[in-house]
Amino acid sequence: MGIVFNYIDPVAFNLGPLSVRWYGIIIAVGILLGYFVAQRALVKAGLHKDTLVDIIFYSALFGFIAARIYFVIFQWPYYVENPSEIIKIWHGGIAIHGGLIGGFIAGVIVCKVKNLNPFQIGDIVAPSIILAQGIGRWGNFMNHEAHGGPVSRAFLEKLHLPNFIIENMYINGQYYHPTFLYESIWDVAGFIILVNIRKHLKLGETFFLYLTWYSIGRFFIEGLRTDSLMLTSNIRVAQLVSILLILISISLIVYRRIKYNPPLYSKVGALPWPTKKVK
């Protein structure tokens, strides 16, 4: 059973000495598809069609940098001994939570500079973010990484998975949980839910519900993974951050409803940066 007939090479093709990996291609596809989805919501909100260009560019750029920094920080003992590895992104090692933090900060700064309402922009892009994350997890599959603990082939067959998934979860002589698939399905389900309930939510709540939904799924799926960043010997960083995001997001939804009673997302046009009251 050790022969993998449908093994997927992580490298899609080579351009001279440069290897182009499926991981990068899939991430790019996720970002582009998310952009086009957000564009439709942008136009409906009465915002200029080019509004998202700078936001996505800077959020993606600084999100990627922050994702790497975040990973390096929690693997610091290794990188102290191997400092040249810090810049070798192609060897793997980025963290989604770090990317969210960097992308969020960059997005808010661009909103401030462009006089845009960050709550409205957050609601517009939230479904696109989780869709891109769901697509991006297939990049982990192509890299044969971010999997769960050992399982039997019989277990995978009971999930009625296609053979190409089962056979590519056979890594170094062992089958593993396809946690990339669990999270991808969870994220796509979140996308479907968010785009369908957004018009019924108040301003800002779609983004906070995105954080809540993603964090719930990430908390449980992270418990299956074998490559988690660890805070201590038994505390996984991603699970701790997920709990914090759930608590913060729900608290902000309740607080804003009590304090400001923001309008429905679907009842507002293009909004400027909030000044006196956060609406």
UniProtKB/Swiss-Prot annotation:
Subcellular location: Cell membrane
Broad EC category: transferase
GO molecular function terms noted in the UniProt entry: phosphatidylglycerol-prolipoprotein diacylglyceryl transferase activity
Family that this chain belongs to: Belongs to the Lgt family.
This enzyme's EC code(s): 2.5.1.145
Amino-acid positions noted as binding a 1,2-diacyl-sn-glycero-3-phospho-(1'-sn-glycerol) in the UniProt annotation, renumbered to this chain: R137
GO biological process: lipoprotein biosynthetic process
Membrane association type: Multi-pass membrane protein
UniProt pathway annotation: Protein modification; lipoprotein biosynthesis (diacylglyceryl transfer)
Role of this protein: Catalyzes the transfer of the diacylglyceryl group from phosphatidylglycerol to the sulfhydryl group of the N-terminal cysteine of a prolipoprotein, the first step in the formation of mature lipoproteins.
Protein name: Phosphatidylglycerol--prolipoprotein diacylglyceryl transferase
Membrane spanning stretches: 18-38, 55-75, 89-109, 203-223, 235-255
Cell membrane in keyword set: yes
InterPro entries the record matches: Lgt
HAMAP family documented for this protein: Lgt
Alphabetical keyword list: Cell membrane, Membrane, Transferase, Transmembrane, Transmembrane helix
One CC-aspect GO term: plasma membrane
Species name: Staphylococcus aureus (strain MSSA476)
